[in-house]
Swiss-Prot record:
Belongs to the TADA1 family. Its main location: nucleus. Pfam families: SAGA-Tad1 (PF12767). Probably involved in transcriptional regulation. Disulfide bonds: none annotated. GO terms for cellular component: nucleus; SAGA-type complex. It comes from the Eukaryota. This is Transcriptional adapter 1. Keywords: Nucleus, Transcription, Transcription regulation. CDD domains: HFD_TADA1. PANTHER family: TRANSCRIPTIONAL ADAPTER 1. It is found in: Nucleus.
């Protein structure tokens, strides 16, 4: 792995020296290509425009180093075998036999596979290499290689030289936790839940709902002791007062059931864009960055928009005019 890191740093240094003052423009174009704002051909054209004819190879070497770093396809060459002598130790020495030239040559030469030390590549579908797939297209979390590639480009854009494996692991865990917070903000608007220590939400979708017409139902929920019941606790333990007896826990459960309504809530439809919009509007702290929040709210509102009948008719008329102009007939 250290070899690929040194190769990437060397390729980046060579490319930066070849670009000179155009290095910021190159990082901006690289970021646009990773975001799929421009195609690979457009990125290559801009790179050739910023580089001279003698330094175009630096652009290719840098892209190859990034792809090699992200893929991490390192294949260790197999052993070449032993070249020890054919004579066995401990064998009584007899009369020395003169071997022929052919026997000496067979003993010294061992055939080797010329591709044994070559790097192995996984075969891919040709259609997968045509476009860069993003998370918004695949509807799945990015792989470790994709996330590391994005982090490398961002690091180069801010003047950093490299990205460590620990940083990629931290960003992966942070991404998973952020998505869990978004799901919690959406589900908490649809299902009832309980609180632990006044802030931790759990037991989503519990069937026991407070009965608003009973005065003691609110008190039963507010005075609920959130502790796991145990049969016995050691005397003198520091947390012995926080445990409750199983009989007390059973009495609390019976009281909650008696203070709850007899009608269960109907099953809800799947989560849609309206639920996501409401969850982000109520729980504004789910996305702390105002720029990211505004951009995602705009995307959600665009997904909720749909054309009316007049707009559909105008679109059909426009398509017919384009087809007539091109000499095509619509069936």
């Amino acid at each position: 792995m250290a070899t690929f890191i040194s190769e990437l740093e060397a390729a980046k240094k060579s490319l930066s020296e070849a670009l000179g003052e155009n290095v910021k423009q190159y990082w901006a174009n690289l970021k646009l290509w990773f975001k799929q704002k421009i195609s690979k051909e457009e990125f290559d054209i801009e790179a050739r425009r910023l580089l001279t004819q003698e330094n175009v190879h630096s652009h290719n070497d840098f892209l190859l180093a990034i792809l090699t770093r992200c893929q991490i396809l390192i294949s260790a060459p197999e052993g070449t075998g032993s070249l020890n002598s054919a004579t066995k130790p401990g064998k009584p020495k007899g009369k020395k036999k003169i071997s022929s030239v052919r026997q000496k040559f067979d003993h010294r030469f061992q055939a080797q596979n010329p591709l044994a030390g070559a790097q192995q590549f996984v075969s891919r579908d040709p259609q997968e290499d045509d476009e860069l797939k993003l998370c918004s297209h695949t509807m799945s979390l990015p792989t470790r290689g994709q996330l590391e590639g994005r982090m490398i480009v961002t690091a180069f854009e801010h003047g950093l030289d490299n990205v460590t494996e620990e940083a990629v692991t931290i960003v992966t865990c942070a991404l998973e936790k952020h998505l869990k917070d978004l799901l919690t903000s959406v589900v908490s608007r649809r299902k009832a839940y309980r609180l632990k220590d006044g802030h931790f939400r759990y037991a989503f979708g519990c069937n026991v709902n407070p009965q608003p017409y009973l005065r003691n139902s609110v008190a039963a929920y507010n005075q609920l002791i959130e502790c796991p019941p145990v049969f016995s606790s050691p005397t003198g333990a520091p947390n012995s007062g926080s445990y409750i007896h199983p009989d007390d826990a059973e009495q609390q459960a019976a009281l909650l059931l008696a203070c709850s309504g007899d009608n269960l809530t109907a099953s809800l439809p799947p989560v849609n864009m309206y639920d996501l919009l409401e969850g982000l509007q109520v729980h504004r702290e789910a996305i702390p960055s105002h720029t990211v929040y505004a951009l995602n709210m705009e995307r959600i509102l665009m997904k909720l928009w749909h054309p009316n009948t007049e707009e559909l008719q105008q679109d059909e008329i426009h398509r017919q005019r384009l087809a007539a102009k091109d000499g095509l007939l619509l069936c």
